[in-house]
């Protein structure tokens, strides 16, 4: 007889390196339920401080438990050397979160290795990492960028939290300790926003397959968090989440959105609907929006909204460039309003002439049509090619 099957999704959260281990300590502290915590580090001393269910010292041979010295190559080698052990602790997971603070050694180098192992075992793999504060130095920032690019190749979805953005929502008197704590808190929110959807039975319940449909091979993702009290609290919290300072870009155009709304037992279905509607309007018209509502009496009259938007890789950067081009072309075409119908053809013809003359003949087209009187002075100097001369010389007259 086969053993009875466990039909609950197995979720494992792996903290890699100092930042990742600190983050899972914070998650354990606040009582994140329904997940197994694994701490992986090359620093034996930091591992001693961890409350994780499983601790893996991957630096005992390579670094003698003394850490990677902020060298990603050492972190990568340490994780590769202990690949079988990491594989063993990840076996059986349906979903794996890889969390790390990018820019150091173990997290930056080891996280892509851990993610690669998790994905090869068939788990839905989500990276939740922080980009370092500016005050941590340029070298760390450069290492972080390389690490993020590497990790993006190995995960289904990657959420990057820029620590600098935390400064914009912090008090000027905030201590360094509190700044890093708030970074851990955001990592917690990213993981909790997803795991609660799966593990906590809610008003509007979601299962693992719902989450997988949005996050499988989704590429880069954005995460926003908002909370509010009082009138229209759900809508206010949703607005705060989609315009969150933590978002490096807009969620416009996202094809997959996870929306988690938590509130006390007085949380109304109508409130949830309004908040979900607001988020759906901000996303792509064809977006797959998965939303769930969780009742948590500990929140009192507060409503908390977590939005995770994914599935717009390649869409976002071009849209920004388009805007830039749009603004410059708008400037060029300022003189055109008089005769909009002629603006396009003349712009094209000038484009071909441009290399011969000045680099800025763009304003010429419309005025040429507008001022048929301008050609007369031209013939004396150039009688042999009327049309070309007109086109090229008109800008000087206009100026």
Swiss-Prot record:
Keywords: Cell cycle, Cell division, Cytoplasm, GTP-binding, Nucleotide-binding, Septation
Compartments, as annotated in UniProt: Cytoplasm
SUPFAM superfamilies, per database record: Tubulin C-terminal domain-like (SSF55307), Tubulin nucleotide-binding domain-like (SSF52490)
GO cellular component terms attached to this protein's record: cell division site; cytoplasm; division septum
GO MF assignments: GTP binding; GTPase activity
Taxonomic superkingdom: Bacteria
Region of interest (Disordered), ranges: 311-399
Presence of keyword Cell cycle: yes
Residue ranges, compositional bias (Acidic residues): 388-399
Main location: cytoplasm
Alphabetical GO biological process terms: cell division; cell septum assembly; division septum assembly; FtsZ-dependent cytokinesis; protein polymerization
Subunit structure of this chain's protein: Homodimer. Polymerizes to form a dynamic ring structure in a strictly GTP-dependent manner. Interacts directly with several other division proteins.
Family membership: Belongs to the FtsZ family.
Protein name stated in the entry: Cell division protein FtsZ
Taxonomic placement: Bacteria, Bacillati, Actinomycetota, Actinomycetes, Kitasatosporales
């Amino acid at each position: 007889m086969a053993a009875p099957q466990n039909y609950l999704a197995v979720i494992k959260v792996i903290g890699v390196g100092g930042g990742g281990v600190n983050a899972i300590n914070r998650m354990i502290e606040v009582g994140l339920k329904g997940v197994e915590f694994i701490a992986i580090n090359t620093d034996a001393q930091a591992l001693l401080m961890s409350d994780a269910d499983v601790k893996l010292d991957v630096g005992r041979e390579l670094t003698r438990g003394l850490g990677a010295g902020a060298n990603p190559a050492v972190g990568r080698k340490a994780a590769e050397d202990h690949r079988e052990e990491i594989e063993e602790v990840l076996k059986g997971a349906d979903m794996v979160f890889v969390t790390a603070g990018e820019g150091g050694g173990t997290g930056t180098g080891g996280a892509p290795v851990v993610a690669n192992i998790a994905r090869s075992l068939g788990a839905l793999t989500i990276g939740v990492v922080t980009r370092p504060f500016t005050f941590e130095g340029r070298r760390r920032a450069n290492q972080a960028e390389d690490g993020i690019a590497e990790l993006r190749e190995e995960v289904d979805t990657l959420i990057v939290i820029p620590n600098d953005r935390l400064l914009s929502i912090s008090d000027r008197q905030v201590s360094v300790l509190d700044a890093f704590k708030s970074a851990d808190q955001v990592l917690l929110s990213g993981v909790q926003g997803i795991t609660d959807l799966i593990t906590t039975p809610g008003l509007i319940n979601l299962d693992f397959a719902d989450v997988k449909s949005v996050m499988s091979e989704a590429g880069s993702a954005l995460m926003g968090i908002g909370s509010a009290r009082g009138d229209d609290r759900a809508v206010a919290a949703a607005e705060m989440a989609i315009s969150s300072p933590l978002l490096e870009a807009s969620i416009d155009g996202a094809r997959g959105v996870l929306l988690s709304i938590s509130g006390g037992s007085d949380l109304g279905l109508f409130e949830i609907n309004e908040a979900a509607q607001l988020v759906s309007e901000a996303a792509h018209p064809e977006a797959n929006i998965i939303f769930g509502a969780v009742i948590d009496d500990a929140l009192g009259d507060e409503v908390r909204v977590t939005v995770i938007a994914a599935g717009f890789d390649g869409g976002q950067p071009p849209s920004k460039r388009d805007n830039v081009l749009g603004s410059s072309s708008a400037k060029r075409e300022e003189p055109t309003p008089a005769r909009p119908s002629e603006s396009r053809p003349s712009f094209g013809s000038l484009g071909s002439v441009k290399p011969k003359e000045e680099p800025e003949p763009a304003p010429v087209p419309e005025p040429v049509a507008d001022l048929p009187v301008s050609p007369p002075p031209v013939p004396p100097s150039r009688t042999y090619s009327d049309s070309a001369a007109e086109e090229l010389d008109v800008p000087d007259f206009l100026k």
